């Protein structure tokens, strides 16, 4: 991603003066996610990076959240399946689904199979804007909502609510900057 993002900093002054985005679309290039998903190597690198950034959060969730009253989980925008994998490894009674776009599903299934969890974790294809969410006792969204405006956030949260049973749980994982920037490594 450095190769793609670094050149945009050259237009920082223009961005500050105009308030307009200084990204690839400015000069007729593809939007970020479109460019990533068009190249399997870039997609694998992106999924690996996103999984690495969130591993600590996913491990903490799997160990700290009380899953004892739940049996199923669906991770919306599940990427390489990491959240579902961590929850399944730490909660043997849980079955998990990792829900993401079709190009991601085979990569997630490779990760799941490599860890011997394909009996309890599956990757399923779908588009969280176009499709209803799969039903589950717990719906998770890791680093999803921050990418979208209020209207889309409300739509995604409504879809999650509709996929949950009474007593279900929606868990949103986002990196929030600590105003003091002393107690949050991501905020530094």
Model regions and ranges:
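Conserved Class I S-adenosyl-L-methionine-dependent methyltransferase catalytic core
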Residues: 1-71
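Alpha-helical subdomain
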Residues: 67-68, 72-188
């Amino acid at each position: 991603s450095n190769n793609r993002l670094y050149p945009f900093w050259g237009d920082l002054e223009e961005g500050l003066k105009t308030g307009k985005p200084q990204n690839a679309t400015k000069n007729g290039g593809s939007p970020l996610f479109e460019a990533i998903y068009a190249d399997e190597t870039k997609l694998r690198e992106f999924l690996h990076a996103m999984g690495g950034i969130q591993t600590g959060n996913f491990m903490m969730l799997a160990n700290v959240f009380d899953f004892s009253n739940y049996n199923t989980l669906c991770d919306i925008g599940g990427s390489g399946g990491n959240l579902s994998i961590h929850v399944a490894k730490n909660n043997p009674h849980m079955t998990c689904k990792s829900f993401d776009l079709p190009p991601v599903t085979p990569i997630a299934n490779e990760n799941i199979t490599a860890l011997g969890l394909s009996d309890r974790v599956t990757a399923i294809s779908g588009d969280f804007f176009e499709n209803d969410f799969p039903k589950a006792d717990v719906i998770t969204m890791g680093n999803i909502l921050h990418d979208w405006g209020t209207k889309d956030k409300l739509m995604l949260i409504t879809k999650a609510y509709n996929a949950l049973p009474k007593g279900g749980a929606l868990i949103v994982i986002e990196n929030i900057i600590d105003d003091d920037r002393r107690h949050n490594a991501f905020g530094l």
